Regions:
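Short, intrinsically disordered N-terminal pre-domain segments
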Residues: 1-5, 9
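Detector for the mature cores of small, proteolytically processed
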Residues: 11-110
Length: 110
């Protein structure tokens, strides 16, 4: 998914009350640990984390900064900062609510 498409969908989820962004793959939920730009500059990779994730507003600000620096490039999901061999594409963004917490899931393409 392109950076601006992801940003638009996160903004839409935020308007529904989404507070935190998570990565969802095979029914497992991960936080977003860090963001890496590829050496050739044609994509960025969100690295999965088992720790807490990031608030939607903060993540939108990160995407805005990346867009102004490197433009509307592909956003991928990865598990490792050293290799991009297993990076996966984003399939969709999903809104969910658990008790009082409203969250957004970045669903990974398998």
């Amino acid at each position: 998914m392109k950076l601006l498409d992801l940003r638009y969908k996160l903004e839409k989820g935020q308007s529904l009350g989404g507070e935190v962004v998570y990565i969802k793959e095979d029914n497992l939920i991960y936080g977003i640990g860090s963001v890496y730009k590829s050496e050739d500059g044609d994509s960025i990779t969100l690295l999965k984390s088992k720790e807490e994730s990031v608030k939607v507003n903060d993540f939108i600000n990160i995407l805005d900064n990346l867009n102004s620096d490197i433009g509307d490039i592909e956003v991928l999901i990865g598990t490792d900062g050293y290799t991009r061999l297993n990076d996966k594409e984003i399939k969709s963004i999903e809104f969910a609510q658990y008790e009082t917490i409203k969250m957004l899931f970045i669903n990974v393409q398998n």
